[in-house]
């Protein structure tokens, strides 16, 4: 008991010291992990145990890459300069080997599992858990004849879905970006909390949100190996186009029928939307504009128009996407919302491409929304803001 009492006193002293310094454990930490910690200025403290290592380097993907300092107790520590608010991926380089920090949950990004830390945005609560009614996120598997395989998706069901059993709901299909997967919008993007908070504030209608695995190839289809191919090369574009076409068919022929037969959906086109970030935005444009009989709300978050954005040419409304933009009044009758978004700090190629697409749509007299997230890069903080602006405009 004496040892327990001493431990409690030490723990209380440690907590007081942490509060005085302003550092608090990150919301991304595993249970019981004291580090990483974040302070109100956005600085991050990392502390990892590697007593036999000779060099440990902190590797933030969109932030500092710095050597850590070894302490006498075998722990390595570092405090970063202030980071911009939002979610940050990072890894550790221990004696040349890249590993995750076991103190945080794992997040899939950049085609691998990585660690992550959340730097709060002062005054913003729209993407954090609040004392409001919460929906549920369910995990589903569906069999796709397009790919000849079982495929995985996460489905957000709004609050009261299980109690108000006579109600039916519109559906938003929400896609991740390249290098990430169907878990990204929940794990990194906090889409469920964003929807919970918007619905509680009566800022958007209750809806079902489907987040599907975004990579697809047909049964027997051999895609070109993208590894090492120059970005924008004919080989890479061919493989991307093949994969996008396969994903389009999977969504329209397998996923939508599965969702409509499994959940209480409003299954007409006026109650179906699709949006996606980066690669998911490009997939959204291809899928929806080729199937306006199925979709009436379209959103591209830092990605829309495919190579119209990544290339250097303007939209040709007469020919692009089978000429759907050639008749603005007819397009407006079918599409209730066309929405584009980009962060003002995104790479020049992305910003310029989306600005060019926006200007082309203006010249073609196509009604649309062009949202710019101030000060954010090609990152989850941009896409959280995108969803916050996009969702209230639906249905």
Go through each PLM region and give its residues.
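Non-catalytic cap/lid and distal C-terminal segments of serine-dependent acyl enzymes
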Residues: 18-27, 31-65, 70-395
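Positively charged n-region of N-terminal signal peptides that target proteins for export
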Residues: 1-5
